[in-house]
Design a protein with these regions (language model features):
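Conserved nucleotide-sugar phosphate-binding/catalytic loop shared by glycosyltransferases and other
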Residues: 2
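Terminal accessory/targeting
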Residues: 5-6, 10-52, 57-186
């Protein structure tokens, strides 16, 4: 499930601080529950058993998690910054850090493609990747979730704030007007 209407109504970046826009983060749990229940009912109507939630713009908060538990059977979130699946707040979390398929030395990774913005070449690369690496894919029911302990929490917070710091520096650098004095002798 990828949200309900994909309309960003909040500027809250949620748990992972990826984007300053959200369909869910920052909204009251009652509104989040309504949206998630409406989305779940569409899948139920089509007899589709949804197992994973992918928050639009990677922005979800703790109320989103509570609403998911309350109105859906979903117990897996595709998001997060750790290199392995982990258990947190009653959900299995699958790391989602990649916008295109690439090999990794270790870990379990998901990658996402947005059909409306991907080129034909990007889809051909994905097809080739799947053909070449199909034996490395793991079914959901075979994943092993690691505990979310203090060490994982620190690692995740470090990765979140490291990215926030880089984005802040980038915004200063790109927003700054650089004055370079040039000596000119008439």
């Amino acid at each position: 499930m990828h949200g309900f209407d994909h309309v960003y109504v909040s500027k809250d970046s949620g748990i992972f601080k990826f984007n300053k826009r959200s369909e869910f983060a920052g909204l009251p749990i009652s509104i989040q529950s309504q949206k998630l229940a409406a989305s779940a009912s569409m899948f139920d109507r089509e007899s589709i058993n949804v197992k994973i939630f992918v928050a639009p713009a990677h922005s979800l908060d703790h109320s989103t998690l509570q609403a998911l538990k309350k109105v859906t059977r979903i117990r897996i979130i595709s998001d997060g910054l750790l290199p392995f699946p982990y258990k947190r707040e009653g959900f299995g979390w699958l790391p989602n850090q990649l916008n295109e398929a690439e090999t990794k030395d270790k870990g379990v990774w998901t990658f996402n493609y947005h059909p409306e913005t991907c080129s034909d070449e990007a889809f051909m690369q994905l097809k080739r990747f799947i053909e070449n690496h199909h034996t490395e894919f793991t079914p959901l029911n075979k994943l092993r979730y690691h505990p979310y302990r203090f060490e994982q929490m620190l690692t995740e917070k470090y990765l979140i704030y490291k990215r926030c710091f880089y984005e802040y520096i980038k915004s200063i650098w790109h927003g700054a007007k650089i004055y370079v004095p040039v000596y000119h002798k008439p």
